[in-house]
């Protein structure tokens, strides 16, 4: 069994359902400390975070490449639906099964073993290697990577490159990597009316009727045209509630929840202003609460993307597509202190599902790609 596969199975065997790390980071810390990494545990409200760094011969003048990821996994769902227990690694049909196999314990193991092989081959490497690991990525993500980034920023620590081990690939290892992500902003809208008997509408004010024209306009609005890297911004309703359940009562208020997925072509302030303008134009009496869970980030083509594309092609023969599709990730936090952030990991077809798995043929090539990037950028 390869070193990467053995470590992957060791991590999968830890039932680290978010935010419980289940000592996964302790396993990683022991391996990193043996390589000469300075390891720091940063705990926050039940969340375990790890910051580990190994400087090269250039000290702080050398380029720093960070590997970022998460030890937490999503809940298993009904155990009886799993073919084999989710926290007992199992091999079937050329695949490794277990919760976290794809998202993202194989990436974590590949980070570690790639670093071990790199340091053994390049003991006098010039640049620095770092690890930023959290147990709060699959949950609220309020005490994980964002807290470590805030701490590093306060210390004046800047990263040059960061690879986030998210499962970005589609059919083959390396066919898709993420060089950016859209931002996410949600709104909770309450439109006020006047409750009354449905037979006497002149004595009431129906908030559903009042909201409907504004809702139609919001749904039809083109928020931007996107750009070279991002599709156009989208606005979608996630929840709409009104009424008491009775058939003869006009409701007193209508509640709407919606979400923007927005690109670098729009700003938080600009989108908020346009929503308020539409609501105000329709004369609504309303309250609107905003929450921004992530800003968009983008890494244009450069040293990191070139190194990663070259490493993937050399290892797998696959031509890589740079993409910004999908949901948010911790890359949105890291981008605050790192100009080049790219996500790359195994295929994502089984993530968060029953019988999550990774094809065994991808395990060592994933490690090799990470090692090749280290060799290109910080040797």
Curated annotation (Swiss-Prot):
The active site is at residues 72, 137. It catalyses: N-succinyl-(2S,6S)-2,6-diaminopimelate + H2O = (2S,6S)-2,6-diaminopimelate + succinate. Its cofactor is Zn(2+); Co(2+). Zn(2+) 1 binds at residues 70, 103, 166. Belongs to the peptidase M20A family. DapE subfamily. The gene is dapE. It comes from the Bacteria. PROSITE patterns: ARGE_DAPE_CPG2_1. Homodimer. Pathway: Amino-acid biosynthesis; L-lysine biosynthesis via DAP pathway; LL-2,6-diaminopimelate from (S)-tetrahydrodipicolinate (succinylase route): step 3/3. It comes from Burkholderia vietnamiensis (strain G4 / LMG 22486). Gene3D superfamilies: Zn peptidases (3.40.630.10). One of its GO terms (biological process) is L-arginine biosynthetic process. GO terms for molecular function: acetylornithine deacetylase activity; cobalt ion binding; succinyl-diaminopimelate desuccinylase activity; zinc ion binding. This is Succinyl-diaminopimelate desuccinylase. Keywords: Amino-acid biosynthesis, Cobalt, Diaminopimelate biosynthesis, Hydrolase, Lysine biosynthesis, Metal-binding, Zinc. Zn(2+) 2 binds at residues 103, 138, 352.
């Amino acid at each position: 069994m390869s070193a990467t596969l053995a470590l992957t199975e060791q991590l999968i065997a830890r039932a680290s359902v978010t935010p419980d790390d289940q000592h996964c980071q302790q396993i990683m810390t022991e391996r990193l400390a043996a390589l000469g990494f300075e390891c720091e545990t940063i705990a926050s409200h039940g969340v375990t975070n790890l910051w580990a760094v190994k400087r090269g011969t250039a000290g702080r003048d050398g380029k720093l490449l960070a590997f970022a990821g998460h030890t937490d996994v999503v809940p298993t769902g009904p155990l009886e639906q799993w073919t084999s227990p989710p926290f007992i690694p199992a091999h079937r049909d050329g695949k490794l099964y277990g919760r976290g196999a794809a998202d993202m314990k194989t990436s974590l193991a590949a980070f570690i073993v790639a670093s071990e092989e790199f340091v053994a081959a390049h003991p006098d490497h010039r640049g620095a290697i770092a690890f930023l690991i959290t147990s709060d990525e699959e949950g609220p993500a309020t005490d994980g990577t964002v807290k470590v980034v805030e701490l590093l920023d306060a210390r004046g620590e800047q990263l040059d490159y960061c690879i986030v081990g998210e499962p970005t690939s589609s059919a083959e290892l390396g066919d898709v990597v993420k060089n950016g992500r859209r931002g996410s902003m949600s709104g909770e809208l309450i439109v006020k009316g006047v409750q009354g008997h449905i037979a006497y509408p002149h004595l009431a004010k129906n908030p559903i009727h009042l909201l409907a024209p504004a809702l139609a306009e919001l749904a039809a609005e083109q928020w931007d045209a996107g750009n070279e890297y991002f599709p156009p911004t989208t606005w979608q309703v996630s929840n709409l509630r009104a009424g008491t359940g009775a058939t003869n009562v006009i409701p007193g208020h209508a509640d709407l929840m919606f979400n923007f997925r927005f690109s670098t072509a729009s700003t938080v302030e600009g989108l908020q202003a346009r929503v308020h303008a539409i609501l105000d134009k329709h004369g609504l009496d309303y309250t609107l609460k905003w929450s921004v869970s992530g800003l968009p980030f983008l890494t244009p083509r450069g040293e990191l993307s070139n190194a990663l594309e070259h490493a993937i092609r050399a290892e797998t023969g696959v031509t890589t597509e740079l993409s910004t599709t999908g949901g948010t990730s911790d890359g949105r936090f890291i981008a605050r202190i790192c100009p080049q952030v790219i996500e790359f990991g195994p295929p994502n077809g089984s993530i968060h599902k029953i019988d999550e798995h990774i094809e065994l043929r991808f395990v060592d090539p994933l490690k090799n790609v990470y090692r090749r990037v280290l060799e290109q950028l910080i040797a």
